């Protein structure tokens, strides 16, 4: 939906630009104004009062969305032997070691999440330049470097997402699909915001959550009331 298209303008007209909506109201509006041609992703953009240039204010983490993401998550697992067997049984889409590394060195990155056992990280170092810029590098902090590969696969396929503030102090995440019930979208948003608030850096001063906008992939943004920090799925 182009910003210059008639459909976008009609969708934008349904939103009061001077109003801030409750999470549930915003979810309903975003559903109503999303493209009807496909099941659009519902995204949240959060402006934080942090300075990402400071290591102790680099907000990043993971959260399990209670209602999932609505996406089919393709998982690549770097493991061998018994752990490779566990990964296959848990539903990993791609499992391997050297052959996976070589494939990625050749430019292949047809997966959404990479998980690795600790003993494979030396090999993965050879493809860090490929995985890193795409946000695919396994990391102990996000639970993707682990010996419990079955649990990690279950979590990411069940709705666990990673988030990280960017250089402009903005944080972006997908919290569901336009086909989701509005209450489920609001609950997913609440789970994400709760975790972001929980890990607030102690050195961050002033207003922490400055602005929140909810939107579909190509639809107009709806500003969400940052003061709502509980009962996200209730009527305003």
Curated annotation (Swiss-Prot):
Keyword Lyase: no
Record carries keyword rRNA-binding: yes
CDD domains named in the record: Ribosomal_L1 (cd00403)
Subunit structure: Part of the 50S ribosomal subunit.
Similarity comment: Belongs to the universal ribosomal protein uL1 family.
Example of a GO MF term: tRNA binding
GO biological process, one term: regulation of translation
Recorded GO CC terms: large ribosomal subunit
Keywords for this protein: Repressor, Ribonucleoprotein, Ribosomal protein, RNA-binding, rRNA-binding, Translation regulation, tRNA-binding
Protein's name in the database: Large ribosomal subunit protein uL1
The protein's role, per its UniProt record: Binds directly to 23S rRNA. The L1 stalk is quite mobile in the ribosome, and is involved in E site tRNA release. Protein L1 is also a translational repressor protein, it controls the translation of the L11 operon by binding to its mRNA.
Entry coiled-coil feature ranges: none
Superkingdom of origin organism: Bacteria
UniProt cross-references to SUPFAM superfamilies, sorted A to Z: Ribosomal protein L1
